[in-house]
Curated annotation (Swiss-Prot):
Transmembrane segments: none annotated. This is Hyaluronidase. It is an enzyme of class 3 (hydrolase). GO terms for cellular component: extracellular region. Expressed by the venom gland. Keywords: Allergen, Disulfide bond, Glycoprotein, Glycosidase, Hydrolase, Secreted. It comes from Vespula maculifrons. Contains 2 disulfide bonds. N-glycosylated on at least two Asn residues by identical heptasaccharide units composed of Man, GlcNAc, and Fuc residues in the molar ration of 3:2:2. It catalyses: Random hydrolysis of (1->4)-linkages between N-acetyl-beta-D-glucosamine and D-glucuronate residues in hyaluronate. It is found in: Secreted. GO terms for molecular function: hyalurononglucosaminidase activity.
Length: 31
């Protein structure tokens, strides 16, 4: 899974709950 912050212009990969990502950025469920 990945979370992207458009304002900061970078993305990171998560292994944490998706709701946490939604609070801070845009969540993408990668297949």
């Amino acid at each position: 899974d990945r979370c992207i912050w458009p304002k900061e212009g970078f993305s990171i990969y998560w292994n944490i709950p998706t709701h946490f990502c939604h609070n801070f950025g845009v969540y993408f469920k990668e297949l």
